[in-house]
Amino acid sequence: MKAYLATFLKYKYLLHNLISRDLKVKYRRSTLGLLWSVLNPLLMSIVISIVFQNFFRFDVPNFAIYYLTGSLIFNFMNEATSSAMVSIVGNAPLIKKVYIPKYIFPLEKVMFAFVNMLFSMIALVIMMGVTKLGIIGSAADLNISWTIVLFFIPMLYTLVFSLGLGLILAAVNVYFRDVGHLYSVWTMAWMYLTPIIYPMNVVEGTWAMNIIRLNPMYY
């Protein structure tokens, strides 16, 4: 364990530079830049809430906040694991030239996705603010208590889970490149098995609930 920690500390500046590089590359040609990390989930939550509340008639108080909370966590996991999966193969030329611990690359992708999610959390704060003011949704149904500060706990759980899964996928992808295509299909099914766009009472008492309980993202 000490050896891994020493190696991590040795390459922490490389990790920082790789994360900074990915941030610059992602928003390099964008006028709004990093602001899209806030606007994208905010706009998506508004569109999804309009569609599902008007066409599917889901009776969920403040559906936009319900959706945004779940989608931020799930999208972080999806982005982190998907990018970590191809990170070693994508950096093969660099790995062949100099010695760098291979786990640095999946770790960097997961941390980049985590940083991106932290910026996206601003969208959730904005949505809660406009709901509390009564601009959208129902302020009476929005009860904000001190327990909101515990939100970082599921975030950290998801971070550790994403890192572990990302490392496994990155190793498998080196030998079996088709795993990327299979994983994209799996994550789509995974999303629908996670109560993000529908309330739990829709599936309670059905066979689907038994499958959903096996889903780590459900908890």
Predicted regions and their residues:
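Hydrophobic transmembrane alpha-helices and immediately adjacent juxtamembrane helices
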Residues: 1-219
